Design a protein with these regions (language model features):
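Feature for intrinsically disordered/low-complexity regulatory segments and propeptides
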Residues: 2-5, 9-72, 76-97
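C-terminal structured domains
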Residues: 67, 71-207
Length: 207
Protein backbone atom coordinates (compact mmCIF):
# COMPACT_ATOMS: atom_id res chain seq x y z
CA UNK A 1 0.00 0.00 0.00
CA UNK A 2 2.87 2.39 0.66
CA UNK A 3 3.82 3.06 -3.02
CA UNK A 4 0.14 3.65 -3.91
CA UNK A 5 -0.40 5.97 -0.92
CA UNK A 6 2.78 7.89 -1.73
CA UNK A 7 2.00 8.25 -5.44
CA UNK A 8 -1.07 10.41 -4.85
CA UNK A 9 0.34 12.61 -2.08
CA UNK A 10 2.56 15.36 -3.38
CA UNK A 11 3.96 16.21 0.04
CA UNK A 12 5.27 12.64 0.35
CA UNK A 13 6.86 12.67 -3.12
CA UNK A 14 8.36 16.13 -2.83
CA UNK A 15 12.15 16.30 -2.76
CA UNK A 16 14.33 19.18 -1.61
CA UNK A 17 14.65 21.88 -4.25
CA UNK A 18 11.56 20.61 -6.10
CA UNK A 19 13.75 18.02 -7.84
CA UNK A 20 11.14 15.24 -7.82
CA UNK A 21 9.42 13.98 -10.99
CA UNK A 22 6.01 15.49 -10.22
CA UNK A 23 7.46 18.97 -9.60
CA UNK A 24 9.32 18.66 -12.91
CA UNK A 25 6.02 17.98 -14.68
CA UNK A 26 4.38 20.93 -12.94
CA UNK A 27 7.18 23.29 -13.98
CA UNK A 28 6.74 22.14 -17.58
CA UNK A 29 3.21 23.57 -17.53
CA UNK A 30 4.63 27.11 -17.46
CA UNK A 31 7.61 26.53 -19.73
CA UNK A 32 10.18 25.80 -17.02
CA UNK A 33 10.68 22.11 -17.64
CA UNK A 34 14.30 21.01 -17.36
CA UNK A 35 17.05 22.09 -14.99
CA UNK A 36 18.84 24.08 -17.70
CA UNK A 37 15.79 26.24 -18.40
CA UNK A 38 15.10 26.85 -14.72
CA UNK A 39 18.76 27.66 -14.16
CA UNK A 40 18.68 30.33 -16.85
CA UNK A 41 15.48 31.90 -15.51
CA UNK A 42 17.40 33.72 -12.71
CA UNK A 43 14.63 32.76 -10.29
CA UNK A 44 14.18 30.56 -7.24
CA UNK A 45 11.65 28.50 -9.18
CA UNK A 46 10.45 26.41 -6.24
CA UNK A 47 8.86 29.56 -4.81
CA UNK A 48 6.50 29.53 -7.79
CA UNK A 49 5.04 26.11 -6.93
CA UNK A 50 1.87 27.45 -5.23
CA UNK A 51 1.02 29.46 -8.36
CA UNK A 52 1.89 26.96 -11.10
CA UNK A 53 -1.77 26.16 -11.73
CA UNK A 54 -2.71 29.80 -12.26
CA UNK A 55 0.44 30.55 -14.26
CA UNK A 56 -0.38 27.70 -16.64
CA UNK A 57 -3.58 29.49 -17.74
CA UNK A 58 -3.67 31.09 -21.19
CA UNK A 59 -4.58 34.53 -19.84
CA UNK A 60 -2.78 36.30 -16.98
CA UNK A 61 -4.53 39.25 -15.34
CA UNK A 62 -2.84 42.16 -13.62
CA UNK A 63 -4.18 40.81 -10.32
CA UNK A 64 -2.41 37.49 -10.89
CA UNK A 65 0.90 39.18 -11.68
CA UNK A 66 0.53 41.29 -8.52
CA UNK A 67 -0.17 38.20 -6.41
CA UNK A 68 2.83 36.31 -7.78
CA UNK A 69 5.18 39.26 -7.23
CA UNK A 70 3.92 39.78 -3.69
CA UNK A 71 4.35 36.13 -2.77
CA UNK A 72 7.73 35.64 -4.44
CA UNK A 73 9.36 38.72 -2.90
CA UNK A 74 7.38 38.56 0.37
CA UNK A 75 6.42 42.20 -0.09
CA UNK A 76 2.73 43.11 0.00
CA UNK A 77 2.71 46.72 -1.32
CA UNK A 78 2.94 45.88 -5.05
CA UNK A 79 0.42 46.85 -7.71
CA UNK A 80 0.18 47.01 -11.50
CA UNK A 81 -0.77 50.26 -13.24
CA UNK A 82 -2.35 49.44 -16.59
CA UNK A 83 -2.68 51.43 -19.83
CA UNK A 84 0.45 53.53 -19.28
CA UNK A 85 1.05 56.05 -22.05
CA UNK A 86 4.03 55.60 -24.34
CA UNK A 87 5.30 57.16 -27.57
CA UNK A 88 5.49 54.91 -30.61
CA UNK A 89 7.62 55.65 -33.66
CA UNK A 90 5.66 55.65 -36.93
CA UNK A 91 7.41 53.53 -39.55
CA UNK A 92 8.61 55.32 -42.67
CA UNK A 93 6.24 53.44 -44.97
CA UNK A 94 3.27 54.52 -42.81
CA UNK A 95 4.09 58.23 -42.72
CA UNK A 96 2.23 60.71 -44.89
CA UNK A 97 4.18 62.19 -47.81
CA UNK A 98 3.12 64.77 -50.37
CA UNK A 99 2.41 63.26 -53.75
CA UNK A 100 1.84 59.76 -52.38
CA UNK A 101 -1.61 58.30 -51.78
CA UNK A 102 -1.25 56.84 -48.32
CA UNK A 103 -3.38 58.70 -45.76
CA UNK A 104 -6.83 60.31 -45.75
CA UNK A 105 -7.29 63.69 -44.07
CA UNK A 106 -9.52 63.37 -41.02
CA UNK A 107 -9.28 59.57 -40.89
CA UNK A 108 -5.76 58.19 -40.57
CA UNK A 109 -3.49 61.17 -41.17
CA UNK A 110 -0.95 61.72 -38.39
CA UNK A 111 1.38 64.70 -38.13
CA UNK A 112 4.87 63.92 -36.89
CA UNK A 113 6.97 60.81 -36.50
CA UNK A 114 5.39 59.52 -33.26
CA UNK A 115 1.94 58.73 -31.89
CA UNK A 116 0.63 58.31 -28.35
CA UNK A 117 -0.40 54.78 -27.34
CA UNK A 118 -1.87 53.22 -24.17
CA UNK A 119 -2.49 49.66 -25.32
CA UNK A 120 0.89 48.00 -24.84
CA UNK A 121 2.55 49.23 -21.66
CA UNK A 122 2.10 48.85 -17.91
CA UNK A 123 3.99 49.89 -14.78
CA UNK A 124 4.96 47.81 -11.75
CA UNK A 125 4.81 49.85 -8.53
CA UNK A 126 6.81 48.48 -5.61
CA UNK A 127 5.90 50.62 -2.60
CA UNK A 128 6.97 51.15 1.00
CA UNK A 129 10.51 49.87 0.50
CA UNK A 130 13.19 50.03 3.14
CA UNK A 131 16.52 51.60 2.24
CA UNK A 132 18.10 48.16 1.72
CA UNK A 133 15.16 46.83 -0.32
CA UNK A 134 15.19 49.92 -2.51
CA UNK A 135 18.85 49.39 -3.38
CA UNK A 136 18.25 45.68 -4.01
CA UNK A 137 15.65 46.42 -6.71
CA UNK A 138 17.77 49.00 -8.52
CA UNK A 139 19.42 47.83 -11.77
CA UNK A 140 22.66 47.55 -9.79
CA UNK A 141 21.06 45.39 -7.07
CA UNK A 142 20.60 41.64 -6.67
CA UNK A 143 16.80 41.82 -6.81
CA UNK A 144 16.52 43.60 -10.16
CA UNK A 145 17.13 40.63 -12.47
CA UNK A 146 14.77 38.28 -10.58
CA UNK A 147 12.08 40.98 -10.60
CA UNK A 148 12.38 41.53 -14.35
CA UNK A 149 12.57 37.78 -15.03
CA UNK A 150 9.43 37.14 -13.01
CA UNK A 151 7.53 39.94 -14.75
CA UNK A 152 8.54 38.56 -18.16
CA UNK A 153 7.55 35.04 -17.10
CA UNK A 154 4.08 36.12 -15.99
CA UNK A 155 3.41 38.17 -19.13
CA UNK A 156 1.61 36.41 -21.97
CA UNK A 157 2.07 39.25 -24.46
CA UNK A 158 5.28 41.12 -25.39
CA UNK A 159 4.33 44.34 -23.60
CA UNK A 160 6.59 47.16 -22.47
CA UNK A 161 6.78 47.89 -18.77
CA UNK A 162 8.37 50.26 -16.27
CA UNK A 163 9.46 49.64 -12.70
CA UNK A 164 8.60 52.30 -10.14
CA UNK A 165 10.29 52.01 -6.75
CA UNK A 166 9.03 54.03 -3.78
CA UNK A 167 10.85 54.39 -0.48
CA UNK A 168 8.84 54.11 2.72
CA UNK A 169 8.23 57.27 4.72
CA UNK A 170 11.28 58.23 6.74
CA UNK A 171 13.67 56.01 4.77
CA UNK A 172 15.23 58.74 2.59
CA UNK A 173 18.82 59.44 3.62
CA UNK A 174 20.72 62.71 3.36
CA UNK A 175 23.39 63.06 0.68
CA UNK A 176 26.88 63.66 2.06
CA UNK A 177 30.11 64.35 0.23
CA UNK A 178 32.79 61.96 1.39
CA UNK A 179 33.38 58.40 2.52
CA UNK A 180 30.36 58.31 4.84
CA UNK A 181 27.90 58.90 2.02
CA UNK A 182 25.31 56.11 1.65
CA UNK A 183 23.48 57.55 -1.37
CA UNK A 184 23.99 56.68 -5.02
CA UNK A 185 24.09 59.68 -7.32
CA UNK A 186 21.14 59.62 -9.69
CA UNK A 187 19.44 56.71 -7.92
CA UNK A 188 19.06 57.41 -4.22
CA UNK A 189 20.15 61.01 -3.86
CA UNK A 190 17.75 63.93 -3.57
CA UNK A 191 18.32 67.60 -2.90
CA UNK A 192 16.31 68.69 0.13
CA UNK A 193 15.73 65.05 1.03
CA UNK A 194 13.20 65.92 3.71
CA UNK A 195 10.81 67.09 0.98
CA UNK A 196 11.69 64.41 -1.59
CA UNK A 197 9.21 61.76 -2.71
CA UNK A 198 11.75 58.91 -2.69
CA UNK A 199 10.61 57.65 -6.09
CA UNK A 200 12.61 56.38 -9.06
CA UNK A 201 11.16 55.01 -12.32
CA UNK A 202 13.07 53.16 -15.02
CA UNK A 203 12.32 50.90 -17.96
CA UNK A 204 12.08 47.18 -17.41
CA UNK A 205 14.75 46.59 -20.06
CA UNK A 206 17.25 48.95 -18.41
CA UNK A 207 20.79 47.51 -18.41
Amino acid sequence: MWPIWRKYRYRACFQTGASDAFSEQMFALIGLGGNAIRGSAQLDCKRLLPYLGLLSMRVHSAALIEAVLRYYFKHAPVFIEQWVERRVEVADFQRNCLGITRCDLGENLVLGHQVSDRSAKFRVHVLALSWQQFHAFLPTGKGYQPLCSLVRLTMRDPLEYDLRLVLAAGEIRALHIGARNVCRLGWTSWLDHEQADGVVTFAGNFH
